[in-house]
Design a protein with these regions (language model features):
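Rhodanese-like catalytic fold shared by cysteine-dependent sulfurtransferases
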Residues: 2-45, 51-54, 64-95, 104-141
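Structural scaffold elements adjacent to functional motifs in cytosolic proteins
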Residues: 58-60
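Short, surface-exposed ligand- or partner-binding patches at beta-edge/loop junctions that are enriched
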Residues: 99
Length: 141
């Protein structure tokens, strides 16, 4: 009986310790928001195609072998390791869509570009895997 009385649900704990819970929850929300914008705004395939139709540039940050195996039409290949050195090849006045295989390497490239003053940076959520899964074409030039 004593053990049952000592058990406290998570909800009961949060309510009983609201003065600790609220700041902790605020910190979690702020952390998640900051992480979500790291390197650029995440966009869907649909949003990416809309931006591409409006003249956005596509930068594929995979290595050249991966790029040659299939990429979005009009994409420029600047591997993540070279992005700082070759940033002069990117037009700062146009929106930039960064792509990679799964959407996991693009944010680091985006951070590097942000450090160099680029503003309009977007990350293709799910990368080229998601692009291909939606039935959109990849070319091999």
């Amino acid at each position: 009986m004593l053990i049952d009385n000592m058990r406290m649900s998570v909800t009961d704990f949060l309510i009983a310790n609201w003065f600790l819970s609220i700041p902790f929850l605020i910190l979690i929300v702020l952390y998640v928001r900051a992480f979500a914008k790291r390197g650029g705004q995440r966009i869907s395939v649909h949003e990416a195609t809309s931006l591409i139709n409006k003249g956005a540039q596509i930068i594929d940050v995979r290595d050249s072998n991966e790029f040659e195996s299939g990429h979005i039409t009009g994409a420029k290949n600047i591997p993540n390791n070279d992005i700082e050195r070759r940033s002069n090849e990117i037009i700062s006045e146009k929106p930039i869509i960064l792509t990679c295989a799964l959407g996991q390497n693009s944010p680091s490239a985006g951070e590097k570009l942000q450090e160099q003053g680029f503003k309009d940076i977007y990350i293709l959520s799910g990368g080229l895997t998601t692009w291909a899964e939606t039935g959109l074409p990849l070319v091999t030039d």
